[in-house]
Amino acid sequence: MEFVKNNVKLIDLAEPGRKIEYAGRVCYKSQDKISDDSYERFIKGIINSGHTSVLEHERKMFAIPVNVFSEKDYEAMFEFEPYFNLTVNMNENPSYFFVSGNIRAWYELLYGPKEIIYHAEADTLKNFLHKDYPYIFEIDENRTPEDVGILYGENAENVCDDLSKHKSYTFEIVGSRSFTHQIVRHRSLSFSQESQRYCNYSGNKFNHSIRFIKSESVDENVLKVIEGAYFKAIENGAKPEEARQILPNCAASTIVVTGTLDDWKKFLHLRVDPHAQKEIREIAETIMSYLRLTKADIGLK
């Protein structure tokens, strides 16, 4: 048995695909398998298995001249709210329609069951995304989209005055299961969490030990009994997904959480409040400190 403290870490992995792999491997506690070229194979695997929620931890933005897409295309994008964030700067020359979405949203928009983008500009979006994620966004090498002035990534960010709806931040958080039950209620955020279904805490990877968040209200002897019962269940042939049923809410869990600055501001508004539960309030205060270090305008004192 091991007692651990709450912990928050800002995940800043700039190379495309790296953050997706890291978040996905947290679910299985397989970060030890990360290598220089492991992310492509890992991401292909999660797409093939249908577990595309992990793709939500990276986000890409386009600046599209307002005359490029038809009204039908804009309506199709808005239909996917809140998966895409859309803003416009009609007072500038040129005027841009800014649209950002996580990689899962772009993948499902451009390769989903419905044909949502109706003309050749879809190829332009695919080509940009293909440069960063060739193993996700396939393109027709024989087609060369017309240059219609669409900007992508940092080039798009550089012409946008307000990135609060477009720029995302990712945190790796260690907290109790009580905490994770609360944070996942913030539905605009994206989550990848340590899976008690797949993690076998009786194994060597976990030092034959279950982590708990220390609580003065919980008797340590009770936790020892619970840990022993878990290990006994595994020894008797139970799968981790069965043995986990007896684990308490103070069991520690690692969760990776991603959201735009606007998403985090809404979270902080509710969770740094004195009336918020103590654990999530303290974690929210740490997140707020990290965001301030990035010079983000969070609008809170």
Predicted regions and their residues:
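Family-specific signature for flavin-dependent thymidylate synthase
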Residues: M1-K301
